[in-house]
Amino acid sequence: MNLKNPLLAVCLVFTFEGYSWWDEGHSLVCNKAANLMSADTSANLFSILESDDYGEGCVWPDVIKQVERRETGPWHYINSPPGKDVITPDSCPEKGCIMSAYEEQLSLLRTGNDAEKKDAVRFIGHFIADIHQPLHTGFGYDRGGNDHLLKLNGNKKSNMHSIWDGEILDFLYKTHGKKDVHKKIDDLAKKYKRNLNYNDDVYPWINESRKIAVSDSVRYLDNRIQNVDEGYLKTHGSIVIDRLALAIARLAILLEVELSG
């Protein structure tokens, strides 16, 4: 990522671990989605962005929520209490949530002016990645796992949200190599893109993530985990790869249709 703006660089240094999927995950999803699109669609995308780096654009929503546009903070997640495991439009509070923000930005991509479309395509790429991160559908009382404090490998202080935002992916990079991990994600994303159809309804995707978040193996709902070891990271690595691949394919399919004109 090219950090030409000094303020952007400062924001990234001091807020990195509060980011959704961290900036690596967002850049990965959006750049790989752009690579899956047809040449005409990607050209339309880059024209809207005024850039050929969709990944950098998709990190932007996490930067602006820190200072410039704090009101967008609630747009990155949906919280739902334990026991309410099917997320519906009624789950979204008055201040907004990721579903309402996604729908608003999709409308702006279709009907907005040039500046609104530029923001919208960046928000949409970011939101689709967030939707596929299970802890973005977590509980309000612990802020989606941010207040579920734990240790990583017995010594490093962390929290449940950070484990799923980046620690699992980082573990995969360290143990398998970034090139191999990216190949697995690419192969799976291509398969999904061949087999999935256009869909602009994010509720099924949200509920996939919620089902993972409250599953027994994740240990977020019951038997809440206090120490995440390498066994946990390895076991859930395949889920992270799958969620990233789905986000890539679904974003590519969505924009193929929305930017086709």
Regions found by a protein language model. Give the residues of each.
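Sec-dependent signal peptide recognition
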Residues: N2-A9
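N-terminal, motif-rich segments that launch catalysis or mediate targeting to/interaction with membranes
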Residues: Y19-F127, P134, F139-G261
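N-terminal signal peptide c-region/cleavage motif recognized by signal peptidases
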Residues: T15-E17
